[in-house]
Amino acid sequence: MARSNYLRIFRVLEEINRRRTIPDIYHEALEDRLVITFTQPSGPLKRSKTRRPKKEYKLQYENTKAHRVYVEILEDYPQLFIPFILATPPKSCETFKLGEFREKHDLSAVKVDLRPDIRRTLDNIANRKGFNQNRRYRRLICTLFPSGRKPATTAETQNCWAYRAAYLNAVHTIFSEQICSAMEVSPTAHSPECQAPQTTSCVEMKLPKQNYQDAIVLLELSLPIDTIKILFPSANERIICSLSPQSGRGPEPSTQIAEPGRHDSQSEQSTISQSEGYILRGASISAILSVFGPRIWGAIEKSQLRKWEKDNLSEETTDCVSIEIHPRRPHCSTCRVRIGFIDDSHFRRKTVHLSLSLSAPNPLALLILEFNIFAVETVEPSFVVFRKYIIHWMFVAVIEEARRNSKGFPKGALQCCEYIHKD
């Protein structure tokens, strides 16, 4: 019985994706089940002078149970919500085994494809039934019909600046103790190329060359499975457990549906992709604050991607943090953090220029300071700008370079750099 229920859900999903619409045959059920989902159950029936028929009590019980199941699917797997409610009548929710359904199917990778005009159909029902301002409904609409394209960044391409060998002191200042500990026990930290006393190769930063798009921070970590579960609570439990070093194997191929590296859908849930590793997306906002610390959390909040997600009512999860776990190296994972760069107009309004003349092989031609923001411009026309509280180690690199090549470097400018860096 359960198997037939599951198959019916995926048959409806396949039909919707094939037609890119909701067939007329489902419209009555769609309206009834949207009302059940987005209106609160009425509570116990009030006593009446005449005895109520048993079917009234049964109907109320079924709708209350269905409300809980529908809402849980909506919260965890919004892309599956419409096919699920169309294939699962309220009566079936009484015996529906949601835990078993999660375990047997990779629900996080499901995507429904609806034409934009279907939004009018849903909005008409919402307006008529009075739940058009319901927070869950608005978030569903933003998930299914995101406004505008998700902001891209050239930091994810080859056309970017890449900085490696971060200063350890700055890493401990910027990241939480939990993240620093995960770096220290990662395989990368013990590799021959990562044995410098003051720097680490576990941190890499990529910045766009010629624009103000988001920056990317790459971290080589060895995160405990419990931490990954906290960051990605919607990830399939079976897949998470299979990534444990004790399991000795990676997830089965059948669990992988999404294309690796795709970033074109709003994330209200974790997406797991398979290539050389397994990519988890849709991190919990509250977990990011506790796991990464307030500085990284603040930088994520200022990113263009996070602002776009908020505009689309993605308030609890974000694609700004993803983790790629390497099944052949279960102790090693690459964490990708997308952070804010700088507002273009704000940068142009408030800048103080200090000229530098350095005789390095790839000399820095200009250092730009602006309160808590600084930029480095090379001899090439491109320049990079980033927030000081995220890139302390780059500021240290500039100072060290200036000290090594002090000829022609204004002494007052060097003192200014050192003073601002202490802030």
Swiss-Prot record:
- Reply yes or no: does the keyword Nucleus apply: yes
Give the disulfide map: none
> Region annotation Disordered: residue ranges?
243-273
Report the superkingdom from the record.
Eukaryota
Region listing for RNA recognition motif (RRM)-like domain, in residue ranges: 157-187
GO cellular component, alphabetical, reads: nucleus
Keyword list (alphabetical) reads:
Nucleus
Protein localization: Nucleus
Principal place of residence: nucleus
Which spans does this entry mark as compositional bias, Polar residues?
A: 243-257
Which positions does the motif Bipartite nuclear localization signal occupy?
46-69
User: What's the record's remark on domains?
Assistant: The N-terminal bipartite nuclear localization signalis required for nuclear localization and generation of the H-MORPH morphotype.
The free-text function statement in the UniProt record for this protein reads: Probably modulates the generation of the hypoxia-typic morphotype (called H-MORPH) with altered biofilm architecture that leads to increased host inflammation, rapid disease progression, and mortality in a murine model of invasive aspergillosis.
Q: Which family does it belong to?
A: Belongs to the hrmA family.
**Name of the protein this chain belongs to:** Hypoxia responsive morphology factor B
The organism that produces this protein has a lineage beginning with: Eukaryota, Fungi, Dikarya, Ascomycota, Pezizomycotina
The encoding gene: hrmB
